[in-house]
From Swiss-Prot:
Domain comment as written in the entry: The leucine-zipper domain is required for its dimerization and activation.
Chain positions covered by the region annotation Leucine-zipper: 306-334
A GO molecular-function descriptor: protein phosphatase binding
One Pfam family it belongs to: Pkinase
Record region (Interaction with PCNT): 264-445
Source species: Homo sapiens (Human)
Full protein name: Serine/threonine-protein kinase Nek2
């Protein structure tokens, strides 16, 4: 039987946002403390409503220790309100942690930042490489306000897909306010959102945990877009290690294919021990959920170690597959670049050929009319033809008659023509050498 709003008791309102209200509730059947978010779907089209319901159903399938658990959805058709029932995180969100550190002028410990990095990356890995073989889920709105902490300070990633659901031409989309500090360069350039866009947002979040401010700040969205496209930011405070700064810098690479994947982040030596501990704990949780007694786990550490190694092998296989896909993508890009280089070379050869033909025609015209070599340039350029005996026609006829009757000048013209032919041959050799060098340069690229 589907749940109803009457099955829950509202305790108090935690906060409000572009989506509506977030309230702390108690389930009447067992007293479990949860939260729900109210979404007013009254102004949505039927297609958007269907997408909203299917998206929430998909989110219910995400089950991971570092992902906020989605329990149920309740549709109140009378008030055109959708309630999304989720896990309650009593530790608040990372935005409040950053605000507290800013007010107290106190940086967060690197150990805490590394734990956040580890657990968030494991959460993203579950979304990008679904363990149950389901469709890839992209978060699309990873920021401190959407990352929560439980009572033991474990990280819980929440609010999946809600930004994408609401960012349509609906009343909710129009109520969006604020500056998108974590928006990736792909989004700024109106390109498709991908897994590496989540990695960019993760890098921005980790940067803000260290510096207590985003890597890119501005007073307007236009100015911010320019700074993000430029991709320049300060180093995190020097109290943090170079290794942490290096991995955050890699996450904030402008080229998405240069950013590390979730597998590459988890394999980083900086958090390798933390990753192993988290995976061991997750394995123990799965065992308890399957009804395995804790004593049998304690009595057979070899079995649990084998299971852990099996999981690690599966993860490495997935990482290898992802790397193969990236290599194929790079090969395709290289093929495109090679075609462009061949086109450029063909155009260059065509230009050289046309230039050579033009030059040959010029020399042939000079050879057929050797008297043009000794004429002033002003006379050659002027092609004035008037009817009757004008000054120009009289000058040209007198000069040509005097040159044709002079044998000594004719010999001189032949010598000059021979010298011009030699120069043409030398120029042709230089052009061939230049053509060879240009091909070598294009081959190096």
């Amino acid at each position: 039987m589907p749940s109803r709003a009457e099955d829950y008791e509202v305790l108090y309102t935690i906060g409000t946002g572009s989506y509506g209200r977030c309230q702390k509730i108690r389930r009447k059947s067992d007293g479990k403390i949860l939260v729900w978010k109210e979404l007013d779907y009254g102004s949505m089209t039927e297609a958007e409503k269907q997408m909203l319901v299917s998206e929430v159903n998909l989110l219910r399938e995400l089950k991971h220790p570092n992902i906020v658990r989605y329990y149920d959805r309740i549709i109140d058709r009378t008030n055109t309100t959708l309630y999304i029932v989720m896990e309650y995180c009593e530790g608040g969100d990372l935005a409040s942690v950053i605000t507290k550190g800013t007010k107290e002028r106190q940086y967060l410990d690197e150990e805490f930042v590394l734990r956040v990095m580890t657990q968030l990356t494991l959460a993203l890995k579950e979304c990008h490489r679904r363990s149950d073989g389901g469709h890839t889920v992209l978060h699309r709105d990873l920021k401190p306000a959407n990352v929560f902490l439980d009572g033991k300070q474990n990280v819980k990633l929440g609010d999946f897909g809600l930004a994408r659901i609401l960012n349509h031409d609906t009343s909710f989309a129009k109520t969006f306010v604020g500056t998108p500090y974590y928006m990736s360069p792909e989004q700024m350039n109106r390109m498709s959102y991908n897994e590496k866009s989540d990695i960019w947002s993760l890098g921005c979040l980790l940067y803000e945990l260290c510096a207590l401010m985003p890597p890119f700040t501005a007073f307007s969205q236009k100015e911010l877009a320019g700074k993000i496209r430029e991709g320049k930011f300060r180093r995190i405070p020097y109290r943090y290690s170079d290794e942490l700064n290096e991995i955050i810098t890699r996450m904030l690479n402008l080229k998405d294919y240069h950013r590390p994947s979730v597998e590459e982040i988890l394999e980083n030596p900086l958090i390798a021990d933390l990753v192993a501990d988290e995976q061991r704990r997750n394995l123990e949780r799965r065992g308890r959920q399957l009804g395995e007694p804790e004593k049998s786990q304690d009595s057979s550490p070899v079995l649990s170690e084998l299971k852990l190694k099996e999981i690690q092998l599966q993860e490495r296989e997935r990482a290898l597959k992802a790397r193969e896909e990236r290599l194929e993508q790079k090969e395709q890009e290289l093929c495109v670049r090679e075609r462009l280089a061949e086109d450029k070379l063909a155009r260059a050869e065509n230009l050289l050929k046309n230039y050579s033909l033009l030059k040959e025609r010029k020399f042939l015209s000079l050879a057929s009319n050797p008297e043009l070599l000794n004429l002033p340039s002003s006379v050659i350029k002027k092609k004035v033809h008037f009817s009757g005996e004008s000054k120009e026609n009289i000058m040209r006829s007198e000069n040509s008659e005097s040159q044709l009757t002079s044998k000594s000048k004719c010999k001189d013209l032949k010598k000059r023509l021979h010298a011009a032919q030699l120069r043409a041959q030398a120029l042709s050799d230089i052009e061939k050498n230049y053509q060879l060098k240009s091909r070598q340069i294009l081959g190096m690229r």
